Swiss-Prot record:
It is a multi-pass membrane protein. This is Inner membrane-spanning protein YciB. One of its GO terms (cellular component) is plasma membrane. InterPro entries: YciB. It comes from Neisseria gonorrhoeae (strain ATCC 700825 / FA 1090). It comes from the Bacteria. Belongs to the YciB family. The keyword RNA-binding does not apply.
Length: 176
C-alpha cells in the first residue's frame, strides 16, 4: 500500500501531462498532490519519516522552480536528486554505524547484521543507478521522459524488488 501511496503524485503528474501535454501544469499537480499527501500522512501518523520530508522539500523546490521559471528541466531533475539523497542517507547512516534501512524496515524483517549491510549497499547502488538513468533519459530523450518516469523507472523498481526478494528469501525463516 505504501508503494501505491508513494506513486500517487507520479500517477497524477503522468495523467496531467498525458491530457494537457504541459509539463508546467503537470508539475503544479504533482506539487499540490505532494503537499496534500505529506499533510495527510503527517495528520494520520503525527510525523513524516526522513525520506518523506526530503521528497516534500524536493517537490516544493523543484516543482516550484518549474512553475515559477517555466522550465521543465527542474522537475526532471527531482527524481535524480531524490534517488541520490536516498543513496547518500543510506550510505551515510550505514557508515556512521546506524543502518538506515534496518531502522526503517527492521521491525518487519529479521536479518543478520551482515545481510543488512549487503542489502544497504545493494540499495545504494540501485539508487545511484536510478539517478543516473533518470538523468540520462531526460538529457537525451526529453520527449520520452514522462513515459520513462511512469513506466520505465517503476518497472526497474519492481525488478529490483523481485531480485531483492530472491536474495532475502534465503535468509527469511520458513514457517511450518
Amino acid at each position: 500500500m505504501k508503494f501505491v501511496s508513494d506513486l500517487l503524485s507520479v500517477i497524477l503528474f503522468f495523467a496531467t501531462y498525458t491530457v494537457t501535454k504541459n509539463m508546467i501544469a503537470a508539475a503544479a499537480v504533482a506539487l499540490v498532490a505532494g503537499v496534500v499527501q505529506a499533510a495527510f500522512l503527517y495528520w494520520k501518523h503525527k510525523r513524516l519519516d526522513t525520506m518523506q520530508w526530503v521528497g516534500l522539500v524536493l517537490i516544493v523546490v523543484f516543482g516550484g522552480a518549474t512553475i515559477v521559471l517555466g522550465d521543465s528541466r527542474f522537475i526532471m531533475w527531482k527524481p535524480t536528486v531524490l534517488f541520490w539523497c536516498g543513496a547518500l542517507f543510506l550510505l551515510g547512516s550505514h557508515l556512521a554505524g546506524k543502518n538506515g534501512l534496518k531502522a526503517s524496515i527492521g521491525r518487519e524483517i529479521q536479518l543478520p547484521d551482515a545481510v543488512w549491510g549487503k542489502l544497504t549497499y545493494m540499495w545504494v547502488g540501485f539508487l545511484i543507478f536510478m539517478g543516473i538513468a533518470n538523468w540520462f533519459v531526460f538529457t537525451r530523450f526529453e520527449a520520452q521522459w514522462v513515459n520513462y518516469k511512469m513506466f520505465g523507472s517503476t518497472a526497474l523498481m519492481l525488478f529490483f524488488f523481485i531480485i531483492q526478494g530472491i536474495y532475502l528469501s534465503t535468509y527469511l525463516k520458513k514457517e511450518d
